[in-house]
Amino acid sequence: MNQTPLRLLIHGASGRMGQALLRLAAEHPESLQIVAAVTGRAPAQRVVDGVPFFAASELPGAPAFDVAIDFSLPEGFDPLLALCVERGAGLVSGTTGISSSQRQALEAAAASIPLVWASNFSLGVAVLDELVERAAQALAGWDCDIVESHHTQKKDAPSGTALTLGAAAQRGGAEPHYASLRAGDIVGEHLVQFTGLGERIELVHRATNRDIFARGALFAARQLQGRAPGSYRVRDLLQ
C-alpha cells in the first residue's frame, strides 16, 4: 500500500544539523519529503537537489507541511512557532538558548499542536534519561555525579544534555553534581554515576557521530504525525 510521504520543513537548513537532516531525509524519499528548507539569509540557489529554499523572511509563504524540524537560533524561533500553530503542523525543535518567554510560548502552543523540544535527540540519551530517573528513585541516599565530555569548541558547561539528565535525577530524588571536560574532537559523552557504600553504578552514553542527532529528530518527526496536541519528550515517543 502506498504511503503518503511526511512533508517536512527544515528550519536552519544551512547549519550543520540542517545539512545533515537534508542529507539523511533524502535517503528515504518514499516516506519523507522536504517541501521547504529555510535559511537565515536569502539562498544563493532557489532549488537544490529538488528542495526549494526560502529565506527566513519568506517563511509565511512556505508551502504546506506536516512537521517543521528546527535547529536554528532563538531569534528565528517565534515566527516558526507561530506558523506551526497557524498551520496546525507539528514542531520538532533542538534550538538552544531560547528564553523563558519562548518556553512559555511553547507550552501554550502545545494546546494546539504536537511538539517536542529537546537539547539532545539521540535515542540512546532518551533511554538513559529514563534509566537515570529510575536509578535515582531506587537508590535513595546515594551520591549522584554527572561527568560530560565534549570537543574543545563547545563553550557551554555543563552541557544541555548533562542538565537534562540532572533534571531526571532530581525527579527521582537525587541531587546531582556536575563536572565537564573539553578535549580533542569528542562528539559527546555523558557518565551518570551513583555511588553508595562499597559499590557504584555507572550509566554511560557515547556519541561517535553527529548524525545520530539528525536521525533522532527525523524519528521524532515521524512519531509526531497523527498525535494529539501536547508537549512530548523524546523518551515519550519511544513508547
Swiss-Prot record:
InterPro entries: DapB_C, DapB_N, DapB_N_CS, DHDPR_bac, NAD(P)-bd_dom_sf
Xref: PROSITE patterns: DAPB
Keyword Nuclease belongs to the record: no
Main location per the UniProt record: cytoplasm
Record's keyword terms, sorted: Amino-acid biosynthesis, Cytoplasm, Diaminopimelate biosynthesis, Lysine biosynthesis, NAD, NADP, Oxidoreductase
GO molecular function, one term: NAD binding
Residues where (S)-2,3,4,5-tetrahydrodipicolinate binds: 151, 160-161
Protein name, UniProt field: 4-hydroxy-tetrahydrodipicolinate reductase
Upper lineage: Bacteria, Pseudomonadati, Pseudomonadota, Gammaproteobacteria, Lysobacterales
Gene field: dapB
